[in-house]
Amino acid sequence: MNVNQVAENLALSHQEELVDLPKNYPLSENEDEGDSDGERKHQKLLEAIISLDGKNRRKLAERSEASLKVSEFSVSSEGSGEKLGLADLLEPVKTSSSLATVKKQLNRVKSKKVVELPLNKEKIEQIHREVAFSKTSQVLSKWDPIILKNQQAEQLVFPLGKEQPAIAPIEHALSGWKARTPLEQEIFNLLHKNKQPVTDPLLTPMEKASLQAMSLEEAKMHRAELQRARALQSYYEAKARKEKKIKSKKYHKVVKKGKAKKALKEFEQLQKVNPTVALEEMEKIENARMMERMSLKHQNSGKWAKSKAIMAKYDLEARQAMQEQLAKNKELTQKLQVASESEEEEGGTEVEELLVPHVANEVQMNVDGPNPWMFRSCTSDTKEAATQEDPEQVPELAAHEVSASEAEERPVAEEEILLREFEERQSLRKRSELNQDAEPASSQETKDSSSQEVLSELRALSQKLKEKHQSRKQKASSEGTVPQVQREEPAPEEAEPLLLQRSERVQTLEELEELGKEDCFQNKELPRPVLEGQQSERTPNNRPDAPKEKKEKEQLINLQNFLTTQSPSVRSLAVPTIIEELEDEEERDQRQMIKEAFAGDDVIRDFLKEKREAVEASKPKDVDLTLPGWGEWGGVGLKPSAKKRRQFLIKAPEGPPRKDKNLPNVIISEKRNIHAAAHQVQVLPYPFTHHRQFERTIQTPIGSTWNTQRAFQKLTTPKVVTKPGHIIKPIKAEDVGYQSSSRSDLPVIQRNPKRITTRHNKEEKL
């Protein structure tokens, strides 16, 4: 039997059991509810019976016909031929009053415009920057007049704000002062009679507390400092925890070395401040050293050392680490030597020698050292002793020493040349004195008379020069009065250096008299250039192997080798024939000092060398386009032929002639100097309105030599003056008269970025 039929029969039997009631029978609410519950139960029963079949039946979709009228049940608009709108859907809603809230929401949505697309991140950041720039420029623009005023001020004295004087109570002011004069005592008596507050405090404790209490700004600053201190403390604690977790041995090794260096510096500082505490620290360090020495960790016997030894051949850092460990092992295993009593007695004499530093011995032993003037006295004493023993062989020995030193060291020091000149002059004077005793008295008388004539003539010439006020470099001939001195003519090769030597000048009358006595002897009173000629003549006979270049080695500056124009050479004796005006001792000392300082400076040669280098650098360079293996065989050791080089060589065109071509003593650089351009003014400075004003100011001297004392002080007044002992605080808005904004503009921008972007978009649309 089918299940459906069973269900229908059950339903019919259930209906038969129901009692038929009349139509007008009144039903209560409970009865209505019971009927609805019965229907619901009946429906559930039918569904349960249907499900007993065991097969899932598919529910067929109900078909509905499209209606031409648009309502909440049908939204088709095919029949009307128009698009479906929101108003069509809202027509049935208008009639019903129960959907008031829905109507309001729909009206609100209808009134709103289409939502714009959100801007990308780059555009938002750009808008933020623009707004922040405009706000910041607006805030900073209020400082422009103050900056302009400070720039225009002739002088700024910091601190700008005047310090307020400290308000002291009257009892503090009168604590160290008493009435001494009768008038003061009378005034104080009157005040005491009237009970005026002379010594009583004017302020109550509450008023004092209010004055001493910090302001709101100070409290905020104090709180900010405490917050910063707490943040730093937490930061360092986190850093310490992080470092504690690091397992790298290399990191801990580096940290350990850094701590050791820091401890060493602190120990040195502590040793200067508190020696007793430093001694205790020294004992702790010694105990740590003993413990480290007992552990013997630095013998290159561990796993780490063995692995580093394998890589030391290829890795430089590993090799360096091995060397450091070996050095540490050597330092730790080193025994501390303690001297015994016998050794102390024996070494007592050596202590005194060790007190003198080795640097002093090096200075005395090293003749070619940095300061040869320190051993000048020692060398001069030894030379004088040698001249006393054998005065006849002095010139030959001196020449031999000069030649030997030149052969060993070509670049002779300036100080050595001055020392040799001084020693040779001393030897010449002593030799002349010895030979003067051996000559007959007759020759002495004749030579004394001739020397007196020379002196008288020289005095007359000096008197004439004083009267006529002639120039110092005027020449006067004294051929008839000067005694004829017999001397050998030097060889042609030696003539040129002799002529280039400068004649020595006579400074005082006492020196003239001494020279008059010495000039009477033949081959003795000649200065150094003549003696050098005689020595150069003797040295080739004695030593034929000596080269001729040594004759011209003593010459410091040879003008003939450098100057482009040849100057006429004049043969002149070394005996002074001209007397210049008497000079002061200060000028003489100054000239002697300059002479000693620039004795060995070959400035002309250096200058001409520098000029040649500048000319070569300014010449245009030829371009060589030769390639190896192009048209010829190429390879290692093969060079292109000269023909190929000439073929592929592009010669540079000759540049314009240099401005200093015909000026031997001038170098004119025609290229732009980058270093000088950095110091040149590109834009006219602020106070000036025309370039001529600036040039006139630069050209005007500001020294006290060309200006009065008052003008000099005004010109050299410093632009900024600071008072010593005063704290220069930054300028505030309250000091100038502005009100400082409590809230910054930038946080406002960061708090409301959407508001700024929408406003910016509206401005762009407008």
UniProtKB/Swiss-Prot annotation:
Biased segments, Basic and acidic residues type: 407-434, 502-527, 545-555
Keyword annotations: Coiled coil, Developmental protein, Differentiation, Isopeptide bond, Meiosis, Nucleus, Phosphoprotein, Ribosome biogenesis, Spermatogenesis, Ubl conjugation
Broad class of where this protein is predominantly found: nucleus
Recorded coiled-coil stretches: 216-245, 316-346, 452-470
Biased composition, class Low complexity, residue ranges: 396-405
GO cellular component: cytosol; nucleolus; small-subunit processome
Tissue specificity annotation: Expressed in testis.
Matches recorded under InterPro entries: SSU_processome_Utp14
Keyword presence, Calcium: no
Family: Belongs to the UTP14 family.
Miscellaneous section: Encoded by an autosomal retrotransposed copy of the X-linked gene UTP14A. Evolution of autosomal retrogenes from X-linked progenitors compensates for X-chromosome silencing during male meiosis.
Protein name per UniProt: U3 small nucleolar RNA-associated protein 14 homolog C
